[in-house]
A protein has these predicted regions:
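Bacterial N-terminal signal peptides
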Residues: 10-21
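Alpha-helical scaffolding within the catalytic cores
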Residues: 33-43, 105-109, 232-236, 286-294, ...
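Hydrophobic faces of well-ordered beta-strands that scaffold small-molecule active sites
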Residues: 53-58, 249-251, 305-308, 349-353, ...
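Aromatic/acidic polysaccharide-binding cleft in carbohydrate-active enzymes
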Residues: 55, 60-61, 434-544
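Active-site neighborhood of glycoside hydrolase catalytic domains
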Residues: 324, 328, 340-349, 354-474
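C-terminal beta-sandwich/jelly-roll accessory domains of carbohydrate-active enzymes
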Residues: 553-627
């Protein structure tokens, strides 16, 4: 996603606009909608609705990865916390990646002999007075083990160190939730490891390092994680992603290209990785999460990884990355992977060259990159950074997918742009093999300030369902899409997290419902529907079952009669689901939240009366039909 300002590229539409208004959402008092839909036993076109249309996106954007990664300590390497993006926080709350160490005269950052990077922490311990380093705002659960590690050194044999988790009680006293006494630090850097088991549950826990004796204690690369993490990722996020079911997840964005991120810096022992300043989004990134951690996340949730390679790093860097992830253990970079603990190749299939790069020399660079990527892995599928007619004409023999990005509510404009790109493909030598992948999409990418909270709303979910219907109608050419973003992201994520938990946004519910109910064959639908209603239908290959997706953006229910006679006797509505406001208040700005995570719900459709179904106002429905 492009930061700071909106951009407009050829076939890459990124606008800053509001949630659709009256032209899409019918006003209060609109008459009830009566609709007859005839579902044709006829394919809309020769293409298929592929599961890959329901993908997601992960990038090093501010609070996105910190909200998924299980590390509980901020600034664990003591390099200093930098302000994040200048965008206003939509809730006015600090993000997870903003957590700093509590201020105290007991400790300071020291540039002399750090274990890693530029600085470490120095605790000044005076005789008879304990020195403390603390970090507040942590969430812990009763009975959970929290592995803790770090690197330390000291200049006095009198030093004694205790690690603890504590919480402040209403009476002003402190309750110790867990404690661990460490052995003495030596004069050179060494690693300590232990475990803290919490005897209570709170979202107001404090991690504390307490040193007694006399002298100086240095600490670096401290880490505290819940014991139930999944390869370093938060278990609750992993489980939510499994429920969401994205078949593909993209790794990339502005940080990767043209940003300062270097994939090879984020390999191996994370305590030894250099941090970097993310100039695009403003924060200092620890590099704890690199492409290898991302690929393992994808494998854990059953998704295919789609990896962006940096144009700025050059062709050889791209070749090395492919070899690192996919090469045999005997290859140069495959050996490095094996040394880091993974002998078997990861088998990453999808590779995108750059992110929203439209420089004059890009087409020639794309060809060189594509040949290098496929030279390292002949089975690789290569995606472009953006689509133009020139790119398709020149690069057709070397790539498989061209990729527009859409951040706008004008779906007529999106469809017009898709048709334009389809025309370029039809007119090219690659007409039989080139297809499209919308590798980023949402209603907006710009700076709304507090208005960005609308990205969490029912109104945005209704827009996203209509966008998915557009993809269904163009699925003969669009074979892959990645909704932006997976978590947090200034309200843009389908999953919103804090230190203690998460909730699923209305968009999450829509994406999961489409993923679970869609079928491969797009069908023709004969109907005269009002502008507030959007319909697509799809069937299984043998036509034994069908699903009708209905988006009702009106503020009155829609009574829908389905004509399924083309499918023969006994073919009828069998059930389905609907995403709606649990209170049915007729408001598009309703959201889920930590206080009320189930205001927008995904529920079973009321028992149909024959083939007649009532779709609630401001809702999205998936109606399943069969014998």
């Amino acid at each position: 996603m492009i930061a700071r300002k909106a951009r407009a590229l050829t076939a890459v539409l990124i606008f800053t606009l509001s949630i659709p208004g009256p032209s899409v959402f019918a006003g209060p008092g609109a008459p009830p909608v009566e609709i007859v839909l005839k579902i044709r036993y006829e394919s809309l076109h020769g293409g298929r609705i592929l599961p890959m249309l329901y993908g997601g996106f992960v990038e090093l954007l501010d609070d996105l990865v910190p909200g998924m990664w299980a590390e509980m300590l901020g600034d664990r390497g003591f390099e200093g916390v930098l302000p994040t993006s200048t965008w206003d926080y939509f809730r006015g709350e600090p993000n997870l990646c903003d957590r700093d160490w509590d201020k105290s005269p007991d400790w300071s950052r020291d540039a002399a002999r750090p274990f890693n990077d530029r600085q470490s922490c120095r605790l000044d311990v005076r005789a008879g007075v304990p020195a403390r380093l603390t970090q507040s705002g942590l969430a812990v659960r009763k009975g959970m083990d929290y592995p803790v590690t770090g690197h330390w050194r000291g200049d006095s044999p009198s030093l004694r160190v205790r690690l603890s988790l504590k919480t402040l009680l209403p009476d002003g006293s402190w309750m110790t939730l867990a404690a661990l006494d460490l052995s003495k630090p030596g004069p050179e850097w060494g690693k300590f490891a232990g475990e803290l088991r919490s005897n209570g549950t709170t979202d107001r826990a404090v991690f504390e390092v307490e040193a007694r004796g006399q002298g100086h204690l240095w600490l670096d690369q401290l880490s505290l994680m819940p014991g139930d993490n999944v390869d370093g990722w938060r278990r609750d996020v992993v489980e939510a992603m499994k429920e969401l079911g994205p078949p593909v997840v993209r790794w990339g964005g502005s940080t990767v290209d043209p940003g300062p991120y270097r994939w090879s810096d984020a390999l191996g022992d994370r305590d030894l990785r250099p941090s970097f300043v993310n100039r695009v989004w403003g924060r200092r990134d620890t590099n704890d999460v690199g492409v290898e951690e991302f690929v393992r996340l994808c494998r854990a949730v059953g998704a295919e990884p789609l990896v962006c390679v940096s144009l700025g790093d050059g062709v050889e860097s791209a070749r090395r990355m492919v070899e690192y992830l996919n090469g045999p253990a005997g290859s140069e970079w495959g050996r490095k992977r094996a040394t880091n603990g993974r002998a078997e190749p990861y088998g990453v299939r999808y590779w995108q060259v750059g992110n929203e790069i439209d420089s004059p020399g890009y087409v020639q660079s794309l060809v060189a990159f594509a040949r290098a990527v496929r030279g390292a892995d002949p089975g690789a599928v290569v995606l472009s950074s953006f689509p133009t007619k020139e790119l398709i004409d020149i690069a057709a023999p070397d790539i498989q997918i061209v990729c527009p990005h859409y951040y706008q509510p004008d779906l007529d404009g999106v469809e017009a742009d898709l048709r334009k790109i389809e025309g370029w493909i039809r007119d090219s030598a690659g007409r039989d093999r080139i297809r499209m992948g919308v590798t980023e999409w949402n209603i907006d990418a710009g700076n709304w300030g507090l208005g960005r909270g609308k990205l969490n709303s029912l109104g945005c979910a209704i827009f996203e369902a209509r966008f998915l219907n557009v993809l269904h109608r163009h699925s003969d050419f669009v074979v892959l899409a990645c909704r932006s973003n997976m978590t947090n992201s200034f309200s843009g994520g389908t999953i919103q997290t804090n230190a203690a938990g998460l909730y699923r946004t209305p968009s999450f519910l829509v994406m999961a419902m489409y993923r679970n109910h869609s079928r491969p064959v797009p069908l023709r639908v004969a109907a005269d529907v009002p502008a507030v209603v959007d319909v697509t239908a799809c069937a299984s290959e043998d036509r034994s079952g069908a699903t009708v997706f209905i988006v009702n953006a009106g503020k009155e229910p829609a009574r829908v009669a389905l004509d399924l006679s083309d499918f023969g006797p006994g073919f009828a509505v069998r059930g389905g689901e609907v995403v709606k406001d649990a209170q049915e208040r007729g408001q598009v700005d309703i959201i889920n939240s930590f206080a009320d995570p189930a205001r927008i719900v995904r529920v079973k459709i009321d028992k149909p009366s024959g083939n007649v179904v009532t779709i609630p106002a401001l809702s999205i429905a998936a109606i399943d039909c069969g014998r």
